[in-house]
């Protein structure tokens, strides 16, 4: 037990130590171009020339958003065509067939929006070709899209008054060449050394200890797993994700993969401070997010290592903790840490089954995604926090009788309306779709039965499974309570719709706020200016997030994990 706690502490320490210098590097990449990866410039110039891009052309926020949305529409059709026809494409030694249109729609939308919700198993649902040219390609592009959006927001915040927020295509390319590619190579090298496969051979047939034969899937796993983690994508190469011994072979790879989930979102908060030359603001935001993250880690590690009281009543030894759904090579401590890390970001990868975690652990996992603000996905994590920051500035200004200002720009009704819509859209989507699915489950049992029955666990936990699915979809997370049978017409299409709304509405709103504030006249700070880089304001922002986001879900949480908790304890 002490060893497990030490492992958890070591991983958190690694994140804290490395996120600071990485944040400084990222700020240099977006601001000056005078970073240690500038030798990639010739490759970038080749890409610009090939695509007909002028990287020096400045865009206003509307042109920036137009470029962002256009490329995403293109990749959607690219992915749909390849996924449906993958059975006829090369690099398919196992003879896997194409996906059905509804599954391809869900898969394509899911990976295009950085969610990676998987209603299929990678071993049989994809080929090596689509793993590389749809899944891995999307994982780089969607991560870089979020980072490019944040780079545009940082540029707008840094300027005193400007009509432009940078060039989307330039930010997209350098996010890949100078941040995501190099880090993926390092992580991939470690995985290969530790035993993760990297090749294009078909399934292996091996004899088991009992004398039977077993087929084991392989493929270019080590190429895909690094960006799965670093890009907060989370879509597993294998069906059981990083629980699979070839996707996550050892405790070392577990540390590296778990570290990879959070390192860029953490570093981007520091990058904000360096870019704006307001390091104290970065520290305050980092502190608020870190506090919420550590609170979740403490809760989940405690409950998973304490075990299940119902199993205690049966007289079964639980000295190793609650081991249901856990890998024995990793243990409940490492699984609990991963469960918080993957839900506090938009990653969604797993090294154990979230459906088997204790009720309050499941509640923490859902709350992280329902709040969707603590570090979050690469780029979009701060952007979600940004909307609450605007609300907190406005409320704080009214409370103390000062003009609501953020970085020298007045926050007025227009920005507040957009921030409010962005903040309330998330709970609206989750709760409305959960209500619809619950209604269908109760009042259309024949339809539910025709789709396989949906739930393996009725009652409190069954409701939690449906709530978790839409929470995960709306938070662009992709993890799931896998007791839910979700590869059906109903779940593929409703989750796909939730994915689209929850990805693009916030990005459009947040970039619009940044563009509107950038156009405003800069007002120098004075004695009457509300300070946003203080601990007091950080606490205020934390409680605004808790009140607006977390409390919106309290009734639903009461019907699910909280009720389940009281049925066990």
UniProtKB/Swiss-Prot annotation:
State the compartments where it is located.
Cell inner membrane
Its topology with respect to the membrane? Multi-pass membrane protein
Give the residue spans that cross the bilayer: 3-23, 64-84, 133-153, 179-199, 255-275, 281-301, 375-395, 421-441, 497-517, 535-555
Pfam families noted in UniProt: KdpA
Origin: domain of life: Bacteria
Return the similarity comment: Belongs to the KdpA family.
Q: Which HAMAP family match?
A: KdpA
> What NCBIfam families does the record point to?
kdpA
Functionally, this protein is described as follows: Part of the high-affinity ATP-driven potassium transport (or Kdp) system, which catalyzes the hydrolysis of ATP coupled with the electrogenic transport of potassium into the cytoplasm. This subunit binds the periplasmic potassium ions and delivers the ions to the membrane domain of KdpB through an intramembrane tunnel.
Q: How does it assemble?
A: The system is composed of three essential subunits: KdpA, KdpB and KdpC.
User: What is this protein's name?
Assistant: Potassium-transporting ATPase potassium-binding subunit
